[in-house]
Swiss-Prot record:
InterPro entries for this protein: Beta_hexosaminidase_sua/sub (IPR025705), Glyco_hydro_20_cat (IPR015883), Glycoside_hydrolase_SF (IPR017853), Hex-like_dom2 (IPR029018), HEX_bac_N (IPR015882)
Example of a GO biological process term: polysaccharide catabolic process
Documented EC number(s): 3.2.1.52
Signal peptide start and end residues: 1-21
Activation/inhibition comment: Significantly inhibited by the addition of sodium dodecyl sulfate (SDS), but not by EDTA, urea, 2-mercaptoethanol or Triton X-100. Strongly inhibited by Cu2(+) ions, in case of which the activity is decreased by 70%. No significant inhibition with Al(3+), Fe(3+), Ca(2+), Cd(2+), Mg(2+), Mn(2+), Ni(2+) and Zn(2+) ions. Strongly inhibited by PugNAc (O-(2-acetamido-2-deoxy-D-glucopyranosylideneamino) N-phenylcarbamate) in the sub-micromolar concentration range. PugNAc at a concentration of 0.5 mM decreases the activity by 50% and the addition of 1 mM PugNAc fully inhibits the enzyme.
Keyword field: Carbohydrate metabolism, Glycosidase, Hydrolase, Metal-binding, Polysaccharide degradation, Signal, Zinc
Superkingdom per UniProt: Bacteria
Protein name: Beta-hexosaminidase Amuc_2018
Thermal behaviour (record text): Optimum temperature is 37 degrees Celsius. Retains more than 90% of activity after 96 hours of incubation at 37 degrees Celsius and after 12 hours of incubation at 42 degrees Celsius.
Organism from which the protein derives: Akkermansia muciniphila (strain ATCC BAA-835 / DSM 22959 / JCM 33894 / BCRC 81048 / CCUG 64013 / CIP 107961 / Muc)
Family under the similarity heading: Belongs to the glycosyl hydrolase 20 family.
Function: Hydrolyzes terminal GlcNAc residues from terminally unbranched N-glycans and from chitobiose. Hydrolyzes beta-1,6-linked N-acetylglucosamine and beta-1,4-linked N-acetylgalactosamine from pNP-alpha-GalNAc[beta1,3Gal]beta1,6GlcNAc and pNP-beta-GlcNAc-beta1,4-GalNAc substrates, respectively, as well as beta-1,2-linked N-acetylglucosamine units from the non-reducing end of N-glycans. Hydrolyzes GlcNAc residues linked to alpha1,3- or alpha1,6-mannose branch, but has low activity on substrates with more than one GlcNAc residue on one of the mannose branches.
Effect of substituting E279A: No significant change in KM value, but 8.7-fold and 3500-fold decrease in specific activity and kcat/KM value compared to that of wild-type, respectively
Broadest EC class assigned to this enzyme: hydrolase
């Protein structure tokens, strides 16, 4: 029977699964290797669960027999992924009382990094809501949750000794002229509980403290940290960036960031701190007397050399805590240091980023906006900014993080990452609507070798997964022109 799947361009897609569809597994992401057998399994009781040293730590082997399932894994990660696959097979079996085929699944991820980013800086997401998002991530074997905690529109991390982060930086008067105040800040305990919740599901949490730009909320709270303090600065109420950068010549700035990094160390055991580093116009550094004097003293030729010095000092602060930095890649490899990790995000620059980061000795995570930015509309006509192109499910699925390059040219690529920016996504419902089902495609891009991936097979599986997610998480992944959650802002700026 044909199964409807409304996913592209607002058009209801219908297709007929192949005749042997009942003799296939519906696993997303597609396993590395699947060997099906003639027998049928009507129970998936876990009969054995063993660690096998011959398997890699993130690999597993799941054997389905008529009597039940046997799991072998190389370590904790592999066991988590094997149990995730077993969970999906049980969901499939629940809808197929005639049974599913027996077989052997031998599996491991193509890339070690498979992440999603949420943006509570723009719209605060309560920690309790994030747990549902995390559960769905784990179902699809994602292993990194990136929290964009600070930006022009809000600051969400508490830092001892800096009370105005909560009283000023975490609040704004409205969003896009809607007249509705918005605020929110996590407690330290909430963040620790979220980290533990994620860890139990094989997910590390990566905090981001954006710098030296994207800091209008910080400027509103502590204007003395900036080159030209503006005591009347407000937390930004619209999208976009400001030209205000923290002043690297002020000791109080480094005292503040040392406190921030100490707090992150106590909360996030991953040891990774994303520092942003993107969209940082240096015109005020050029004009700042303190910065000009520092450049002259150090014989710096321009503000980009000052930017390099800024991040060298920041990296040194992190190193004292055993932490390492990550950045949004801006193409100027000179401000990064060999061995550091950057995210390729700028539209149309993926191939260039792969080549330049390889030459510079950097690790790369593929987050190319035309494939990976899940806040972009997924159906033509959905509301967002006018400049955003529609990124369909198939466009996301077409992503090869290596862009066809061989291992010797792309071996520094660590994985794939999909941000869900939230300037116009006010709550979990909007966040999930934009993230799924495209996150399923990103999951397969990060996990599955190109040789086992198939768009047609993915569409077949996704029809089943709509039912799996509906029953397990009470969430419908159907996407049509008319079922987008109500959109508060009518302007398109």
């Amino acid at each position: 029977m044909a199964r409807p799947l409304p996913i592209l361009g607002g058009i209801l897609l219908s297709f007929s699964p192949p005749a042997e569809a009942t003799a296939q597994y519906s696993i997303i992401p597609e396993p590395s290797r699947t060997e099906l057998r003639q027998e049928t399994a009507k129970t998936l009781q876990l009969l054995s669960d063993q660690e096998v040293p011959t398997l890699e730590t993130d690999a597993y082997r799941l054997t389905v027999t008529p009597q039940g399932a046997h799991l072998a894994s190389g370590g904790r990660e592999g066991r988590i992924y094997g149990l995730a696959t077993l969970r999906q097979l049980r969901d499939q079996l629940a809808g197929q009382p005639e049974g599913i085929p027996c077989g052997v699944i031998t599996d491991k991820p193509r890339y070690p990094w498979r992440g999603l980013m949420v943006d509570p800086a723009r719209h605060f997401i309560p920690a309790a809501d994030l747990k549902k998002f995390v559960d769905m991530m784990a179902y699809y074997k994602f292993n990194r949750l990136h929290l964009h905690l600070t930006d022009n529109q809000g600051w969400r991390l508490p830092v001892p000794g800096y009370p105005k982060l909560k009283s000023v930086a975490s609040r704004r008067e409205e969003s896009f002229g809607d007249g509705i105040p918005h605020e929110g800040m996590y407690t330290k305990q909430e963040l620790k509980e979220l980290v533990a919740y994620c860890a139990a599901r094989g997910i590390d949490v990566i905090p981001e403290i954006d710098m030296p730009g994207h800091n209008q909320a910080l400027h509103a709270a502590y204007p003395e940290f900036f080159c030209f303090p503006k005591p009347d600065m407000n937390v930004r109420t619209t999208a976009g960036n400001s030209k205000e950068l923290v002043c690297p010549q002020k000791p109080e700035v480094w005292k503040f960031y040392a406190s921030v990094f100490n707090e992150l160390k106590d909360i996030f055991p991953s040891g990774i701190v994303h520092l942003g580093g993107d969209e940082a116009p240096t015109e005020l550094w050029e004009k700042c007397p303190l910065c000009r004097e520092a450049r002259t003293r150090a014989a710096m030729k321009d503000e980009q050399e000052q930017m390099k010095a800024f991040f060298a000092k920041t990296a040194a602060l992190l190193a004292k805590n055993g932490q390492t930095p990550q950045f949004w890649y801006e193409g100027n490899a000179g401000i990064y240091h060999p061995g550091e990790t950057v995210y390729a995000w700028r539209q149309g620059q993926a191939l260039q980023s792969i080549e330049k980061t390889k030459k510079a000795g950097l690790n790369l995570i593929m987050a190319s906006s035309e494939y990976c930015y899940l806040d972009f509309p997924q159906i033509q006509g959905q509301r967002n900014w006018g400049w955003m192109k529609t990124t369909t499910l198939q466009k996301c699925y077409d992503l090869d993080p290596a862009f066809g390059k061989p291992e010797k040219e792309a071996g520094h690529i660590r994985g794939v990452h999909a941000p869900v920016w939230a300037e116009r996504l006010p709550d979990l419902n909007h966040l999930l609507y934009r993230a799924y089902p495209r996150a399923c495609a990103i999951a397969e891009a990060g996990w599955s070798p190109m040789g086992v991936r198939s768009w047609e097979n993915f569409r077949r599986k996704l029809a089943d997964h709509r039912q799996f997610i509906l029953k397990r998480f009470n969430y419908d992944m159907e996407r049509t022109q008319g079922n987008e959650p109500a959109f508060r802002w009518e302007n398109n700026k």
